[in-house]
C-alpha cells in the first residue's frame, strides 16, 4: 500500500544553492531525497514542494509531499527524517495526506515574510537572515504603498524579466509591515507569487520609504507592466517562505 506523506519543513537557505536539485550543488531537495533513498533501501523517492526557493532564501513553512510504501506513523517519520537530515533542515510536522493532496496544486495561498535590519551599524550575526538598510525610512509612506498592492493585479513590473509565465495576474490578500526597533518585517499573503516578486516589491517600497518615489507610484507601476520602472531586487537573505495555506486554513497571523 502506498501512502502520501505531507511534511512542513523549515530550512536555513544560507548554504544551499536553492531548493531544486542541481547537479553538483547542495540543495534542499537533494538532501531530503538523499535521506529518503537511504530509508527506502536505495530506491529513489521524489518529493514535490509547494514551490522553489532561490539560493540564500529561507523557509519556515515549506510544504512537501511524497509517496511511500513504508508503514511508519507520522511521528516515526518526523523522528527518522530529523535524525538524518543536516542541521540546516528540520521537519516541523508530518501528516498522512489523502492521495489527492498536492503540495503545490492544492495550495490556496502562500505567506512570505521579509526582514530588514535598519540600524546604522551592520550586525554580523544577522547578515544571513535579514537585509541591511541603514537609511532613515518614512514608515507611514511605506504602509500606504503596501496598501496599494492589495487586490488582484498584473504584477509584471514586480517580477524578474526572466519570468516565463505569461499570466502574471495575482491576488494579494495582505501586505503589511511591523516595526520592532531597528527590525522591519514585511508580511505578504497572496494567491501566488511570481519569480522575485516579493523581493522586488520590498526593494520598491524601501525606495518609497527613502523618499525616492511617492507611495502612489505603486499604482503607476502596476499599470505600466515594466520591470525596468520598479525598484531593485532586495537581497535573498531577508526572504522567508513562511506558510502555505490549504483548504480550511485562514490567513491570520
UniProtKB/Swiss-Prot annotation:
SUPFAM superfamilies: Pseudouridine synthase
Subunit structure: Homodimer.
One BP term from GO: tRNA pseudouridine synthesis
GO molecular function annotations of the record: RNA binding; tRNA pseudouridine(38-40) synthase activity
Name of a matching Pfam family: PseudoU_synth_1
EC numbers, comma separated: 5.4.99.12
Catalytic residues (UniProt): 54
Cited CDD domains: PseudoU_synth_EcTruA (cd02570)
Gene: truA
Catalytic activity, reaction form: uridine(38/39/40) in tRNA = pseudouridine(38/39/40) in tRNA
Protein name (Swiss-Prot/TrEMBL): tRNA pseudouridine synthase A
PANTHER family registered for this protein in UniProt: PSEUDOURIDYLATE SYNTHASE, TRNA PSEUDOURIDINE SYNTHASE-LIKE 1
NCBIfam families: hisT_truA
Binding site for substrate: 112
Family to which the UniProt record says this protein belongs: Belongs to the tRNA pseudouridine synthase TruA family.
Alphabetical keyword list: Isomerase, tRNA processing
Domain of life: Bacteria
Function per UniProt: Formation of pseudouridine at positions 38, 39 and 40 in the anticodon stem and loop of transfer RNAs.
Amino acid at each position: 500500500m502506498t501512502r502520501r506523506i505531507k511534511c512542513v519543513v523549515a530550512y536555513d537557505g544560507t548554504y544551499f544553492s536553492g531548493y531544486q536539485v542541481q547537479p553538483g550543488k547542495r540543495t534542499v531537495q537533494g538532501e531530503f531525497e538523499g535521506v529518503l533513498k537511504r530509508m527506502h533501501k536505495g530506491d529513489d523517492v521524489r518529493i514535490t514542494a509547494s514551490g522553489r526557493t532561490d539560493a540564500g532564501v529561507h523557509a519556515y513553512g515549506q510544504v512537501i509531499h511524497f509517496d511511500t510504501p513504508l508503514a511508519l506513523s507520522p511521528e516515526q517519520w518526523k523522528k527518522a527524517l530529523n535524525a538524518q537530515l543536516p542541521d540546516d533542515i528540520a521537519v516541523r510536522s508530518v501528516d498522512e495526506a489523502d492521495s489527492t493532496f498536492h503540495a503545490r496544486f492544492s495550495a490556496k495561498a502562500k505567506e512570505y515574510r521579509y526582514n530588514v535590519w535598519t540600524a546604522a551599524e551592520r550586525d554580523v550575526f544577522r547578515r544571513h537572515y535579514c537585509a541591511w538598510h541603514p537609511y532613515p525610512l518614512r514608515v507611514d509612506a511605506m504602509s500606504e504603498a503596501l496598501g496599494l498592492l492589495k487586490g488582484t493585479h498584473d504584477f509584471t513590473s514586480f517580477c524578474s524579466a526572466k519570468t516565463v509565465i505569461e499570466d502574471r495576474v495575482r491576488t494579494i490578500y495582505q501586505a503589511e509591515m511591523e516595526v520592532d526597533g531597528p527590525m522591519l518585517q514585511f508580511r505578504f499573503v497572496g494567491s501566488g507569487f511570481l519569480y522575485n516578486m516579493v523581493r522586488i516589491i520590498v526593494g520598491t517600497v524601501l525606495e518609497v520609504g527613502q523618499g525616492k518615489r511617492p507611495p502612489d507610484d505603486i499604482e503607476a507601476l502596476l499599470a505600466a507592466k515594466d520591470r525596468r520602472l520598479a525598484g531593485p531586487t532586495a537581497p535573498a537573505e531577508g526572504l522567508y517562505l513562511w506558510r502555505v495555506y490549504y483548504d480550511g486554513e485562514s490567513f491570520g497571523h
